[in-house]
């Protein structure tokens, strides 16, 4: 890698660690078949990616967004709430338990009857 290329890039991306991440991501994109925005000039992918960043044919912001998207494992999708989902499916009212007016005494009596005790 040419030192001049790295020093040119530091003007565009001041943080060297971020520069390494962006250049590596762009080099992987090139390896995967992405089109080059500059002439290769017999350079390897990491050098080409640094030259693209230095010449601003690849925006650092666009590269940063693509890097973030490539590292995401779960993409958030807006899903309706359960109450809204029931209404959308034709239920009208969301599922709720029926009103229960059973007192403690009635509950104990029902349990005893179920067990066969008087």
From Swiss-Prot:
It comes from Dinoroseobacter shibae (strain DSM 16493 / NCIMB 14021 / DFL 12). It comes from the Bacteria. Promotes RNA polymerase assembly. Latches the N- and C-terminal regions of the beta' subunit thereby facilitating its interaction with the beta and alpha subunits. The gene is rpoZ. The RNAP catalytic core consists of 2 alpha, 1 beta, 1 beta' and 1 omega subunit. When a sigma factor is associated with the core the holoenzyme is formed, which can initiate transcription. One of its GO terms (cellular component) is DNA-directed RNA polymerase complex. SUPFAM superfamilies: RPB6/omega subunit-like. Residues 78-104 are annotated as: Disordered. Belongs to the RNA polymerase subunit omega family. This is DNA-directed RNA polymerase subunit omega. It catalyses: RNA(n) + a ribonucleoside 5'-triphosphate = RNA(n+1) + diphosphate. One of its GO terms (molecular function) is DNA-directed RNA polymerase activity. One of its GO terms (biological process) is DNA-templated transcription.
């Amino acid at each position: 890698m040419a030192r001049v290329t790295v020093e040119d890039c530091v003007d565009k991306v001041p943080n060297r660690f971020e520069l390494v991440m962006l250049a590596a991501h762009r080099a992987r994109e090139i390896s995967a078949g992405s089109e080059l925005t500059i002439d290769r000039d017999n350079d390897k992918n990491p050098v080409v990616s640094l030259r693209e960043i230095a010449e601003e044919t690849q925006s650092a912001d666009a590269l940063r967004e693509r890097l973030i998207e490539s590292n995401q494992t779960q993409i958030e999708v807006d899903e309706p709430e359960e109450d809204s989902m029931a209404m959308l499916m034709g239920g009208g009212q969301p599922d709720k338990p029926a009103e229960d007016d059973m007192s403690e005494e009635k509950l104990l009596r029902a349990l005893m009857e179920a067990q066969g005790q008087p």
